[in-house]
């Protein structure tokens, strides 16, 4: 992946973790979009083609594993799970 054109979705309910991951990725020239829950992430993947999704497993409401189960046929993007 070319970091100058790689678009990453970071999904985490913790503002601090989401901000930290975004800051690190931005400093390394990745384009980053964030979502604070699985429902917000689902809306974003409907309109944007991401190169990678970094996804928290434990979130209130729909968790990361439920997001994967419900979207695996529609999304072919690699996913990294955070715990």
Descriptions of predicted regions:
Residues 46-48, 70-77:
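Conserved phosphotransfer cores of two-component systems
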Residues 59:
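Receiver (REC) domain active-site loop signature in two-component systems and cognate sites
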Residues 36-40, 63-66:
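Acidic catalytic/metal-coordinating carboxylates
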Residues 1-7:
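Non-catalytic signal-transmission and effector/linker regions of two-component phosphorelay proteins
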Residues 11-12, 35, 53:
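Conserved sequence signature across two-component system core domains
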Residues 48-54:
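Active-site beta3 strand of CheY-like receiver
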Residues 12, 56, 83:
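Active-site residues of response regulator receiver
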Residues 15-33:
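Two-component/phosphorelay signaling modules centered on CheY-like receiver
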């Amino acid at each position: 992946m070319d970091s100058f054109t790689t678009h990453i979705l970071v999904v985490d309910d913790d503002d601090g973790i989401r901000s930290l991951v975004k800051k690190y990725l931005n400093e390394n020239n990745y384009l980053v979009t964030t979502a604070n829950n699985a429902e917000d992430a689902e809306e974003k993947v409907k309109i944007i083609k991401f190169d990678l999704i970094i996804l928290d497993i434990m979130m209130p409401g729909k968790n990361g594993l439920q997001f994967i189960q419900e979207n695996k046929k529609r999304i072919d993007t690699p996913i990294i799970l955070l715990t």
